[in-house]
């Protein structure tokens, strides 16, 4: 509710400002009446809100007057209640409005006037102060409200006087409904007349700041206030002693009752009775008593009958004095806060002034804009009239142009008929020419179709020729593969023939050696039998002959087993050779097929270009095959050279013989066990050569996994050297044929039986070594 009241007051305030600046007097009065009614409603409901609102809307000049008028009142009237507001309202209703030339009352006059009516209201119940001299909590609250209403009454009286005076000076007589407790600051600000009050005719008036509590009035001020003709001109006996009522606010309720009795006696008699001497001695009225009262006061002080009552009253006065001092301090603090509020009000008024100036500038700008709009509107009207005239001229021109166009169209229709006849004749001729051209086009289309069919036939013939060429190339490739196979088979056959020749030579040598050994053994037997028969010991030669025959039988069995192993390894070699050859043939055919598929799937943009490209690709393939054949032939020659070098190296190193024990006559020779153990000799060959040389060894070990070698591994000096194609394997330092020869039979003649057995063992081991060398050569 407080916010709504403030907002409504602000809106009314702005409206009244605008009306004061730009409106007429009747509307201004109406708005002022509305504001006064609204503020009256706020004073009736809010209590203490209306005086603050009246203070906030006063002008800076009025705020200076109100700073003097808002002196904190003493709170000695505990007996005053809510009736003060009614008394003030009745006071302002009964008070006649001052005329146009009447001067405003001073602060002391207005305060004395309000205190008089407050004292009249309090006179009906003088026993309230006797019942509760110290003041209960409810009584103190009523005293605060009474003092607040009293201060608000002073402010209202001054604001009403200022408002009425400003309205009269502006030439407007204020209506009766505007005499309320609130004013408007714009009236005081717009007031530019003479000051509110001039000095009286009797002399200058000493009108200083409002008295602060405790206040002591000087004697000459009291005499001037009493002898002031304005108090006597009021027509009421209560204004003759205004200074007594001014100081009633500083006297406690007990003295207020005595003062009221004193005033009553003073009004009824010319020489009033004096007040109590103790009260005048200790209260603030002791310095303000008139000279006519001093004699009765001194006479009253000499009486000793009421001493105890006076002492009690003096204690009560002292207590009230202390309480009033505390109230005075509190009221001084309130005065400081009200001064701060007044400063804020001044700032607010300056802000309102700035806003009003801004509003004036806006109104000037709006007036300029309206003038500019008016000129632009006039200009637009003239432009519209000009455009309407121009549009009228254009319509007339359009009508004349339409008339001319209609006449021209009639003439054009007459000429167009002649043109149509000519065009019909020309179209007939063009149709005949078109039919002739269509016949020629049909003939050309037939010729084009014939040429297309001929081209298709040629393309088919070209495709057939290309297919025949591709088939011929495939056949040529197959024949070349067959030729390569034949060449490889011939080379293998040559190698086999060489191996067979070597084997035959070895067999011949072995046969001759065995025959020689047999002859030597027989000769030894005969020689051994002859000395035995002569000596008569026939048991030992028979035993030696039996032993030798058994050894011979064992050797023959070993030889037969080795021969069987040799034939077996020859068969395996041939099988591996054939399988390797077939794998190479399959790889060659797969490469040829891949080349043919690439050639077939290659794009052929045109028949002639495809035929030429086919020829070129065929030539390239022939060249590639020739280069491949040359490379293979070079590899074969290189391998043959390596084989020859290895053979020569094996012949150069005759001193390296391999010793190894014989195993039972089974299948696998000891060569491959030695190859598995002696891997140090492979360091001189490349990785590819090692792989090709290891292939047959892996095959043989896979085929015979269950066979266990019995022969011990050869020493590290014995190492295999394989050829580049992996077709043959030879030991690094093979023994020469001379090392394989048996010892001479003559050397065994003079030896004993043990020596002969050792020699036979050595011969057998040499034979086994020769057989292993032969098997390696064959492999």
UniProtKB/Swiss-Prot annotation:
Locus of motif PDZ-binding: 776-779
Q: Where is the composition biased (Basic and acidic residues)?
A: 100-112, 141-152
| Protein name in the entry | Angiomotin-like protein 2
Name of the gene encoding the protein in the UniProt record: AMOTL2
The transmembrane segments are none
Annotated Pro residues bias: 196-213
Q: Which UniProt keywords apply?
A: Cell junction, Cell projection, Coiled coil, Cytoplasm, Endosome, Isopeptide bond, Phosphoprotein, Ubl conjugation, Wnt signaling pathway
Q: Which GO terms describe its biological process?
A: actin cytoskeleton organization; angiogenesis; endothelial cell morphogenesis; establishment of cell polarity involved in ameboidal cell migration; hippo signaling; negative regulation of transcription by RNA polymerase II; positive regulation of protein localization; regulation of cell migration
Say what the protein does. Answer: Regulates the translocation of phosphorylated SRC to peripheral cell-matrix adhesion sites. Required for proper architecture of actin filaments. Plays a role in coupling actin fibers to cell junctions in endothelial cells and is therefore required for correct endothelial cell morphology via facilitating transcellular transmission of mechanical force resulting in endothelial cell elongation. Required for the anchoring of radial actin fibers to CDH1 junction complexes at the cell membrane which facilitates organization of radial actin fiber structure and cellular response to contractile forces.
**From start to end residue, where is composition biased (Polar residues)?**
177-193, 680-690, 725-740
Give the protein family.
Belongs to the angiomotin family.
Q: Where is this site: Required for interaction with MAGI1 and ACTB?
A: 107
Glycyl lysine isopeptide (Lys-Gly) (interchain with G-Cter in ubiquitin) cross-link, renumbered residues: 347, 408
Q: What is the effect of changing residue 107 to A?
A: Abolishes interaction with MAGI1 and ACTB. No effect on interaction with CDH1
The Phosphotyrosine modification is found at: 107
């Amino acid at each position: 509710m407080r916010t709504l009241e403030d907002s409504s007051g602000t809106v009314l305030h702005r409206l009244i400002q605008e009306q004061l600046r730009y409106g007429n007097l009747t509307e201004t009065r109406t708005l002022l009446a509305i504001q006064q009614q609204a503020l009256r409603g706020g004073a009736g409901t809010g209590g203490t809100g209306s005086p603050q609102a009246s203070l906030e809307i006063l002008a800076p000049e009025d705020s200076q007057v109100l700073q003097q008028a808002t002196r904190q009142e003493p709170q000695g009237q505990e007996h005053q209640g809510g009736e003060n507001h009614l008394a003030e309202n009745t006071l302002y209703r009964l008070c006649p409005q001052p005329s146009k030339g009447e001067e405003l009352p001073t602060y002391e006059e207005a305060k004395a006037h309000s205190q008089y009516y407050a004292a009249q209201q309090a006179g009906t119940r003088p026993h309230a102060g006797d019942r509760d001299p110290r003041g209960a909590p409810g009584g103190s609250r009523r005293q605060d409200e009474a003092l607040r209403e009293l201060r608000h009454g002073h402010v209202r009286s001054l604001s009403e006087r200022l408002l009425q005076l400003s309205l009269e000076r502006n030439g407007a007589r204020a209506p009766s409904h505007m005499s309320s407790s609130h004013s408007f600051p714009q009236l005081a600000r717009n007031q530019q007349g003479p000051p509110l009050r001039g000095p009286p005719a009797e002399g200058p008036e000493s009108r200083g700041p409002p008295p602060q509590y405790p206040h002591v009035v000087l004697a000459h001020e009291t005499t001037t206030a009493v002898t002031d003709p304005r108090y006597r001109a009021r027509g009421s006996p209560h204004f003759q002693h205004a200074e007594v009522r001014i100081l009633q606010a500083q006297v406690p309720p007990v003295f207020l009752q005595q003062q009221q009795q004193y005033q009553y006696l003073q009004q009824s008699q010319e020489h009033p009775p004096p007040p109590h001497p103790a009260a005048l001695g200790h209260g603030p009225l002791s310095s303000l008593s008139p000279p006519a009262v001093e004699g009765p006061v001194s006479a009253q002080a000499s009486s000793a009958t009421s001493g105890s009552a006076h002492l009690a009253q003096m204690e009560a006065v002292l207590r009230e004095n202390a309480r009033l001092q505390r109230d005075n301090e509190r009221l001084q603090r309130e005065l400081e806060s009200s001064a701060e509020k007044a400063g804020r009000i001044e700032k607010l008024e300056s802000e309102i002034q700035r806003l009003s100036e801004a509003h004036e500038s806006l109104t000037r700008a709006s007036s300029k804009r309206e003038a500019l709009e008016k000129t632009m509107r006039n200009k637009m009207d003239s432009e519209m009239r000009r455009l309407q005239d121009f549009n009228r001229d254009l319509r007339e021109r359009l009508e004349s142009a339409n008339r001319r166009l209609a006449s021209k169209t009639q003439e054009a229709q007459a000429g167009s008929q002649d043109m149509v006849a000519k065009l019909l004749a020309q179209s007939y001729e063009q149709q005949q020419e078109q039919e002739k051209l269509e016949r020629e086009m049909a003939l050309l289309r037939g010729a084009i179709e014939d040429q297309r069919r001929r081209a298709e036939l040629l393309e088919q013939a070209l495709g057939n020729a290309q297919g025949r060429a591709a088939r011929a190339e495939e056949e040529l490739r197959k024949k070349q593969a067959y030729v390569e196979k034949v060449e490889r088979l011939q080379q293998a056959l040559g190698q086999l023939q060489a191996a067979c020749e070597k084997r035959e030579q070895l067999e011949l040598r072995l046969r001759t050696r065995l025959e020689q050994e047999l002859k030597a053994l027989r000769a030894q037997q005969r020689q051994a039998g002859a000395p035995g028969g002569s000596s008569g010991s026939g048991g030992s030669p028979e035993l030696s002959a039996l032993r030798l025959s058994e050894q011979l039988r064992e050797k023959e069995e070993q030889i037969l087993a080795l021969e069987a192993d040799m034939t077996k390894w020859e068969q395996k070699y041939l099988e591996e050779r054939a399988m390797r050859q077939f794998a190479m043939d399959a790889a060659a055919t797969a490469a040829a097929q891949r080349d043919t598929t690439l050639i077939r799937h290659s794009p052929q943009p045109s028949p002639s270009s495809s035929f030429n490209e086919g020829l070129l690709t065929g030539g390239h393939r022939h060249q590639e095959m020739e280069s491949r054949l040359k490379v293979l032939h070079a590899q074969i020659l290189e391998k043959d050279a390596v084989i020859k070098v290895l053979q020569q190296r094996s012949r150069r190193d005759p001193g390296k013989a391999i010793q190894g024990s014989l195993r039972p006559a089974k299948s696998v020779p000891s060569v491959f066990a030695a190859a598995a153990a002696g891997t140090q000799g492979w360091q001189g060959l490349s990785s590819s050569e090692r792989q090709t040389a290891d292939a047959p060894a892996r095959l043989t070990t896979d085929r015979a996994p269950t066979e266990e070698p019995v022969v011990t591994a050869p020493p590290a000096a014995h190492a295999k050297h394989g050829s580049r194609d992996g077709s043959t394997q030879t030991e690094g330092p093979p023994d020469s044929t001379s090392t394989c020869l048996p010892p001479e039979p003559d050397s065994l003649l003079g030896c004993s039986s043990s020596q002969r057995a050792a020699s036979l063992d050595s011969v057998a081991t040499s034979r086994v070594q020769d057989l292993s060398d032969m098997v390696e050569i064959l492999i």
